[in-house]
Amino acid sequence: MPIEQKIDTPISTIMRFRPANRDELKYLKIFLFEQGTNQWNYLPEDGIEHQFERLAAGVDSALVAVDNKTPVGLVIYGQPGDVPSLFLPYIIDTNVIYISEVTVHSGYSGRGIGTALLNKIIEQAAEMDVSALVIDRHEENLASAEMMRKAGFIALGSFYDSARRTVGSQKTTVLTKRVP
């Protein structure tokens, strides 16, 4: 199914979550650009290329939401302790997992898939002996704010980030979720 196709059917009971396969990374990169690009998200081509090189090398990991064999959601996260220095002032313990991307197909938005992906990472983190998860978003991105709130993330703070944010307040909000 083409990535850009609008999906109007309700989520089926066949929805499942699985690790990304190396042989689908090219497709998932296109999916991320096509479904994740909007005024709030920072998706520089060179940064995403580097992100997918890390995925191919097994440095980072990705989880895919699949409906009837079609990827409809994606979350990318790093290894414990691998947190961008930009966020270090907001965390006390570096034994955390940084979630770099969460994207849901536009035809599936508002159905809880992003929250479900985050909850799956929270479940995995509990088995990895980490203290928390860290994620960021544009301060004014209400859809991301709600998704993260539903998954139990709380804001640690916001900072002016004109290098990555070109609209609205130009602030990034850093959030965390303690691992149970």
Residue locations for each model-derived region?
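Conserved acyl-donor/pantetheine-binding loop and adjacent beta-alpha core of acyl/acetyltransferases
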Residues: 74-101, 162-166
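Conserved catalytic-core motifs of GNAT/GCN5-like acyltransferases
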Residues: 136, 149-169
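A short, internal acetyl-CoA/4′-phosphopantetheine-binding micro-motif in the GNAT/acyltransferase core
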Residues: 93-94, 100-109, 137-138
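A short beta-loop-alpha structural element at the N-terminal edge
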Residues: 12-30
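Conserved beta-strand-loop-alpha-helix junction that forms the acyl-donor binding cleft
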Residues: 135-145
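Active-site rim helix/loop that mediates acceptor-substrate recognition in acyltransferases
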Residues: 40-67, 76
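Conserved acetyl-CoA-binding loop-helix of GNAT-fold acetyltransferases
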Residues: 104, 110-123, 146-150
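Conserved GNAT acetyl-CoA-binding A-motif
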Residues: 125-137
